[in-house]
Amino acid sequence: MGLVTTKEMFEKAYNGGYAIGAFNVNNMEIVQGIMEAATKNNAPVILQVSAGARKYANPVYLKKLVESAIECNKKSGTDIPVVLHLDHGPDFETCKDCIDTGFTSVMIDGSKYDFETNVALTKRVVEYAHPRGVVVEAEIGKLAGIEDDVNVKEDDAMYTNPDEAEEFVKRTGCDSLAIAIGTSHGAYKFKGEPRLRYDILEEVSKRLPGFPIVLHGASSVPQEFVKMCNEYGGNIPGAKGVPEEMLRKAASMAVCKINIDSDIRLAMTANIVCPVLTGWIFRQFWCIIINVSTKEMCLKAVRMRITAVHGVLS
């Protein structure tokens, strides 16, 4: 099957009332863990590359890793839909580079700009991407929190306006839209009880029937990973994610893509600091043990999210 776009994937998800998990990747172990988890669940998956991952591991390198994982799947007799996606593309040039590299989906994040500038920037990316068979995700509204180069203070966060969302999609021709309904980037999603603005989501979906909505900052922040990190020198008290039942409800209301990054980072951190600090890594084997165990922990984190929101292929 090779790499695909989100077009058919989102159409099936929308009609089926489920969402596709989009997981951030930046090395071989994460790619292996995500692909193995998706394959075991026979589920479609989106592998996405952030600005930080582009700096750390060249996008060409990451594309080859993903293609190799797909090829390994084919040789083992399994074949699932896989999308390679640019997460939070900051400008036209970055999106163009990823499109030219062979990504099948890109996100242009113009949410930091005023409405008209965001429209113009997104439309420019769409006009370049569509003739090349690439789909475009855009964003309107601002999520609080930090993710790589994306840093929005809580006071600057802004819920999505449904009127603007409708106009934005019609004027830009984007293929999916990330909206702000109360989630945030990072491991601290909520100060008090978790609350999402389903009323905004419902209104947007009414104005844009059949159109796929994206939910950023949707990690559930498993407490077992938080506990492991804190027990071995970490300091992330009170970390709180989006409960799985909230994700399932969002998936039943037009959300077709749910972004997961913090869960992967927590899984990796927990699995590295625990064996290192408890002393059961022998010096000559530490690289092998960390690489294998990191993949397994990423696999576990991804399967938890897939169970919550993914559709299972027939």
Predicted regions and their residues:
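C-terminal alpha-helical cap/extension of soluble enzyme domains
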Residues: 230-236, 242-276, 283-284, 296
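Short, intrinsically disordered C-terminal tails of secreted or membrane-associated proteins
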Residues: 309-313
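N-terminal charge/polar-biased segments
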Residues: 1-16, 231, 273-276, 283-284, ...
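Short catalytic-loop micro-motif centered on adjacent basic/acidic residues
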Residues: 20-24, 84-85, 107, 213-215, ...
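Short catalytic/ligand-gating loop segments at beta-alpha or beta-beta junctions
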Residues: 216-220
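Alpha/beta enzyme core
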Residues: 6-12, 28-52, 60-77, 89-212, ...
